[in-house]
């Protein structure tokens, strides 16, 4: 065989092996795609009791985050009402720690199906955020809602870092199940104690994107959005006290005593008994009303949660043992709605339809897990350094506050954000929706802060239409309306 023939034979063999490798890769990709498709379709929700008829798809179920410990997080995903493959994806987290994003975010605020007060069904939300984006609700950490672990020690190790690691693992595994959304613009949003969860998770996503040269491992994170969030302990607590005083919840004498006895420049505000005693007077006054919405009547039902918040255990423990603000008491326009939601998600047919249980061995679903709240280890005292880092990294950050929330009030948020010392890009001004002032907004270099006039802790439940306009502006990266005149 001459050299020319040998070279030609070698070329043919090389081409054959290359073609074989390509074929193997194609078969592998096809199998992976089929596995993803089957896993996704197994989570398709098709017969949810009381659900209004809709044209979009939604999925619910579990995503494992630690197979050796039997740990899995529950999610509920709603495709955008149109162009879901093109619209951004928003992950929503509620706070507590220990409260459910399914029970609050999805069913009382921004999801397409809201709890009906007849305790049996759902009603369509005309202001659902999936009009603008794909919405992914996650019950995090384990022990919240339907999320669980088969290893009891996991529940003893819950803290801020545990939560963010599991949430990141969830995202990686969820994108394997829904690969068609991997390239979508991705945002993380939440409220209350998610003010800690969200920046922590955003930083982890950002850092891993920076470390991974393989673009297939990247998550297309563009920014985060927070409502009435925990940000920085000293500033949050000082704002909590000042807001109660400025809204005539506490007396001048109580306000003076607290400022004299409590060191708000410390990471540990509760460093002496005298401070705790002074703070107890704020609790005493707030116990008479709905702290999450100062001007909404409190729920007077006989629910277990209502009884708990009236108990001596709650009043004694919620500051001294946890050193944090409590999870939500009775929020929303209808402060009894939490009880309706609990009835619905503990129905066998509902749990089976959502793939939360087999409909026989039921999960005991609650809107907030008080054991998680009281046993939580608070590792992070301030997320302001994360804000600075991610602003420098080019992420979009918007923060909003309902101005009638006494739990994490607008004043504390302003104190915290002012500590960043960011240059002002656009001066404080009103922003408008439907020809009315919705609130006020100030744009900083790298951050936008806005208020919602007349809204409590869960802003979308008070101001659904303007909240939808707000999320639309956020994902599009455009300023909030500066005029009463509507433009098309």
UniProtKB/Swiss-Prot annotation:
PROSITE patterns, per database record: CARBOXYPEPT_SER_SER
Any one Pfam family match given in the protein's UniProt record, by short name: Peptidase_S10
Paired cysteines (S-S): 99-368, 262-275, 299-336
Signal peptide: 1-28
Active site: 192, 405, 457
Any Gene Ontology biological process: proteolysis
Enzyme Commission number: 3.4.16.-
EC top class named in words: hydrolase
Gene3D superfamilies: 3.40.50.11320, 6.10.250.940, alpha/beta hydrolase
Residues that carry a glycan: 150, 263, 364, 375
GO molecular function: serine-type carboxypeptidase activity
Its biological purpose: Probable carboxypeptidase.
Protein name from the UniProt record: Putative serine carboxypeptidase-like 30
């Amino acid at each position: 065989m001459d050299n020319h023939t040998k070279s030609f034979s070698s070329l043919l063999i090389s081409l054959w092996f290359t073609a074989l490798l390509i074929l193997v890769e194609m078969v592998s990709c096809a199998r992976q795609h089929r596995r993803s498709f089957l896993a996704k379709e197994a989570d398709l929700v098709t017969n949810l009791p009381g659900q209004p008829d809709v044209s979009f798809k939604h999925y619910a179920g579990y995503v494992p985050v630690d197979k050796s410990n039997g740990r899995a997080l529950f999610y509920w995903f709603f495709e955008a009402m149109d162009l879901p493959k093109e619209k951004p994806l928003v992950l929503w987290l509620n706070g507590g720690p220990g409260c459910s994003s399914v029970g609050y975010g999805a069913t009382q605020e921004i999801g397409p199906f809201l709890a009906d007060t007849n305790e049996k069904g759902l009603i369509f939300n005309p202001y659902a955020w999936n009009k603008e984006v794909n919405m992914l609700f996650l019950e995090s950490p384990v022990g919240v809602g339907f999320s669980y672990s088969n290893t009891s020690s996991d529940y003893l190790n819950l803290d801020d870092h545990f939560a963010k690691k599991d949430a990141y693992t969830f995202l990686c595994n969820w994108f394997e199940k829904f690969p068609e959304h991997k390239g979508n613009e991705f945002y993380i949003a939440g409220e209350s104690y998610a003010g800690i969860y969200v920046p922590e998770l955003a930083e982890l996503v950002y850092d891993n994107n920076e470390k991974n040269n393989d673009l297939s491992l990247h998550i297309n994170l563009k920014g985060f959005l927070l409502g009435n969030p925990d940000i920085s302990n000293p500033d949050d607590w000082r704002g909590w006290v000042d807001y109660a005083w400025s809204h005539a919840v506490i007396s001048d004498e109580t306000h003076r005593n607290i400022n004299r006895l409590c060191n708000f420049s410390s990471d540990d505000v509760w460093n002496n008994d005298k401070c705790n005693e002074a703070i107890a007077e704020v609790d005493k006054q707030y116990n008479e009303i709905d702290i999450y919405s100062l001007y909404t009547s409190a729920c007077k039902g006989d629910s277990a949660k209502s009884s708990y918040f009236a108990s001596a255990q709650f009043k004694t423990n919620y500051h001294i043992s946890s050193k944090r603000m409590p999870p939500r008491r009775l929020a929303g326009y209808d402060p009894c709605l939490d009880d309706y939601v609990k009835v619905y998600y503990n129905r066998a047919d509902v749990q089976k339809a959502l793939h939360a249980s087999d409909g026989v061995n039921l999960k005991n679903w609650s809107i907030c897990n008080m054991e998680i709240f009281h046993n939580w280890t608070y590792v992070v005292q301030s997320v302001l350094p994360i804000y600075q880092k991610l602003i420098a990294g080019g992420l979009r950050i918007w923060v909003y506050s309902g101005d009638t929330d006494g739990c994490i009030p607008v004043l504390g948020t302003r104190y915290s954000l002012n500590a960043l010392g960011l240059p002002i890009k656009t001066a404080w001004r009103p922003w408008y929706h439907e020809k009315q002032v919705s609130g006020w907004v100030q744009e900083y270099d790298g951050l936008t802060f806005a208020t919602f006039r007349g809204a409590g802790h869960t802003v979308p439940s008070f101001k659904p239409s303007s909240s939808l306009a707000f999320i639309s502006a956020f994902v599009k990266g455009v300023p909030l309306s500066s005029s009463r005149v509507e433009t098309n």
